[in-house]
């Protein structure tokens, strides 16, 4: 059983964020609702609206958060000082009270443009940079408690696949199978099912296919990509199954993807660039003659959100560090015919990588 995060955990995270901002030559960090605020203060508003909520973190003074007065009760448990504002007040003037007039701040990537512009009007000398660019490891490197949650989410997703793989596919619609996946995600401990992709036959050539009323048929390749949120952290896995025995070509394409996924996993090590993981997978697929049919990056970070830094993509030279969690999900997509993708979540360790998904990567034959 994972322990809940405490005020001490959030205080340590805010202290670390302030130190990283100072090291980057910044005055502090501005955090708006979303995963950043949940991570740093344990607070998530009931809804994200046009009313500004913003946490200001400085190395030189205690953290403080501006909140709408009507939302103050929900914010009280956060281990920060609160400054509320009422409808009719100048919210940006109130927010400016928490900031240095000529400060340079890392701000949440998800901050609304209207709020950034409002702060700039209130403090014309202030400057803002992307939090991801300025503090790249803040959420990307998970601590032991987070890694425990990530591993549990991965194991739960594995249990979903093992159960769905024993069910009947042929003669059922993609939508029906997707509904089963969503139900199983909850049954295996997720609070929410975030997404379910069931892409059969030619639909498998669309990586982000939305399940349809197409009836799965004998001879189909079926891509199953699904995930949810468990104890606040995300799962995301993909397996491709075949209805009956595959053709020689289908088996060959599948094996290329499997080998590419393994090559990418083998490239995971501290100090390696994120792009090295992408290059490893892409090299295998290109070498087999399918380079133009691998049409997306090899992976994305995952944690409080399903897609977050770091990204395994050409041009991403950021070094891999122990504690980073990300997907490895190469694919080959043949328009009008079929697609194959295999995805695991991997946690970088001191000496390589640890798969958080353990179901077989061999082609599963289903009925």
PLM region descriptions:
Residues 1-367:
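Active-site neighborhoods and metal-handling regions in enzymes and metal-associated proteins
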């Amino acid at each position: 059983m994972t322990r809940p995060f405490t005020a001490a955990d959030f205080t340590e995270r805010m202290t670390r964020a302030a130190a990283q901002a100072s090291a980057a030559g910044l005055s502090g960090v501005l955090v708006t609702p979303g995963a950043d605020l949940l991570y740093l203060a344990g607070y998530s508003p009931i809804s994200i609206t046009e009313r500004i909520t913003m946490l200001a973190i400085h190395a030189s003074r205690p953290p403080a958060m501006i909140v709408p007065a009507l939302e103050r009760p929900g914010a009280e448990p956060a281990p920060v000082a609160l400054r509320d504002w009422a409808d009719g007040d100048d919210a940006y003037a109130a927010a400016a009270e928490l900031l240095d007039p000529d400060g340079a701040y890392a701000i949440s990537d998800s901050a609304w443009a209207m709020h950034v512009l409002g702060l700039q009007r209130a403090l014309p000398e202030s400057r803002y940079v992307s939090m991801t660019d300025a503090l790249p490891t803040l959420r990307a490197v998970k601590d032991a408690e987070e890694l425990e949650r990530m591993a549990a989410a991965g194991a739960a997703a594995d249990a979903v696949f093992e159960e769905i793989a024993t069910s009947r596919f042929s003669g059922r619609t993609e939508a029906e199978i997707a509904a089963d996946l969503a139900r199983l995600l909850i049954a295996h401990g997720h609070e929410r099912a975030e997404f379910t992709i069931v892409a059969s036959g030619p639909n498998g050539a669309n990586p982000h296919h939305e399940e349809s009323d197409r009836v799965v048929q004998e001879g189909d390749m079926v891509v199953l990509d699904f995930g949810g949120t468990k104890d606040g952290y995300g799962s995301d896995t993909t397996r491709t199954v075949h209805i009956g025995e595959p053709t020689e070509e289908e088996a060959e394409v599948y094996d290329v993807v499997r080998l590419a996924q393994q090559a990418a996993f083998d490239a995971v090590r501290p100090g390696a660039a994120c792009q090295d993981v992408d290059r490893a997978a892409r090299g295998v697929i290109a070498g087999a003659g399918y380079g133009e049919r691998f049409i997306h990056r090899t992976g994305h970070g995952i944690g409080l959100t399903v897609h977050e830094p770091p990204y395994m993509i050409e041009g991403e030279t950021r070094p891999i560090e122990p504690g980073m969690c990300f997907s490895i999900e190469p694919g080959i997509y043949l328009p009008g015919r079929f697609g194959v993708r295999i995805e695991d979540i991997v946690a970088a360790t001191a000496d390589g990588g640890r798969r958080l998904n353990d179901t077989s990567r061999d082609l599963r034959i289903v009925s």
